[in-house]
Amino acid sequence: KVSTMNKILEAILSDIKNLIKIDNPKKFILSNIPYLSFLYIGNIFSKHINSYVGGDIIDRITVGISDIGTLSYIPSLNPRDLLVGISVAGLVKLIVYSKGKNKKKYRQGKEYGSARWGESKDIAPYIDPKFENNVLITNTERLTMNSRPKNPKYARNKNVLVIGGSGSGKTRFYVKPNLMQMHSSYVVTDPKGTLVLECGKMLYENGYDIKILNTINFKKSMKYNPFAYLRSEKDILKLVQTIIANTKGDGEKAGEDFWVKAEKLYYTALIGYIYYEAPEKEKNFKTLLDMIDASEVREDDETYMNPIDRLFEALEKKDPSHFAVKQYKKYKLAAGKTAKSILISCGARLAPFDIRELRELMSEDELELDKIGDRKTALFVIISDTDDTFNFVVSIMYSQLFNLLCDKADDVYGGRLPVHVRCLLDEFANIGLIPKFEKLIATIRSREISASIILQAQSQLKAIYKDHADTIVGNCDSTLFLGGKEKTTVKELSETLGKETIDLYNTSETRSNQKSFGLNYQKTGKELMSQDEITVMDGGKCIYQLRGVRPFLSDKFDITKHKNYRLLEDYDKNNLFDVEEYLTNRDKVKLKSSYKINRLNI
């Protein structure tokens, strides 16, 4: 029985301990010290009134209060007095607790929202003291290039979403000012090809290696060969995926899943063969097209073997487990008629390569994409803003660029490139789909790579990247709105800015035999900037949002105040960069170097 009672008592004590669980004893003691005074008061008052004899408790309390001057301040150890003191302290604690639980929360002036415009003190922790080490956003707001500030809470990525309608100054107020900073390597999308003319000389004379990929005029472009950057089978798959995503097949079946997968198998097999087996000079799209042209299929003769079949047959004998052989055997499972449809779609998809100038452009490589993070380089990617026929070339280039730089940062430089690479992606919607871009933009930050996505409207991003558009936007810590009236963009911006609380006066007048007037004062909520106000925003103003900071309504950057403005063609027409002369001189240097090497070999 004793044992059972002990167990019951232990269980009761355990329940009490769990009920009064104290996570922080020190904090518990400090918070309850004030209540000891009430315990003391209750104790000595109980002792005082109980010193009187006769009458009931009310009489003794009355007499005790009237003789309060005789109160003794020495506490009593009488259990009854101690209990009264504890009861008084407990009652006060209960009242305070109850008040705290039921107290009303007032936020004066913030009843309907606390949104406000940012001030200079809000952006100050994010600005680098040295002007040249900043990303230029507005005339008063900048963002340090230092990805590891002293206080980590001020660390922000350098990805910027820039939105502005046609004529809002995306190039003048954002791209050019940031090129004038000259603190990084730059990869710039250049619609119409004017940026390289206006800024190229400034960059070249400041030690930049200028690269140009021109999809408008191939004769004014350096050569780009995607095959030069294939390092593994993984790269082959990425190249095939980018080609499929940014080109179109032929016929009503071209977009169906089966035919697309069949095309992927065929491209993968052929590119795999070229990568592993072809001589260095033949590793290009011309060889790929020649192989497709040689892939004759006869519907009435399943046993017919074309030259490509014989190539793969010989390769299989040499290496049955070869990557290209495995892909080709899967493709060959298709019957003659099906294989013919696949080949037709392949031919249509790669039809742009029938243009001799494009084949020549992609026959060898001069861009050296993998070296952009090694030294200061400016790559201008010139695309047409009216015709997207050759934009798939740009999409392939960007896809390879991001993957090459990330791999080099990890494999060679321990995770961070020695020179930060800023990608100023003007007319981003015209570049095409960059596979897995939503994942790339989330990971490039740590490798010293950043992307500025420049759009005319936010809906353009959703049209290309569908459900991944929000992920891409979420990985841009900065958003700059330069003006526009596209409904979706304006609505989302107004909602993001939030609401502020304003004062509202209502007046009323009643007309009858006797006139009466009324005045009513109240508070209400209003958008910090309504959709209507955003659409009619002053052309010289812009809105900048930085993660974790109040938004800024500021003047656009005044390009003429930058110290390097005098180096632009905008300032002096003599600063025009002669692209043809630059490319000709490079070719001469290249020819001399090749001649010297050949002579040494002889």
Features from the language model and the residues they span:
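Conserved ATP-driven motor cores of ASCE-family P-loop NTPases powering translocation/secretion/packaging/pilus
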Residues: 441-543
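Conserved long hydrophobic alpha-helices within structured protein cores
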Residues: 131-137, 392-400, 493
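Accessory regions of macromolecular translocation/handling assemblies
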Residues: 1-188, 195-208, 508, 512-536, ...
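A short glycine-/small-residue-rich loop at the edge of a beta-strand within enzyme catalytic domains
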Residues: 125, 131, 392, 428, ...
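P-loop NTPase motor domains
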Residues: 4-8, 36-44, 156-449, 464, ...
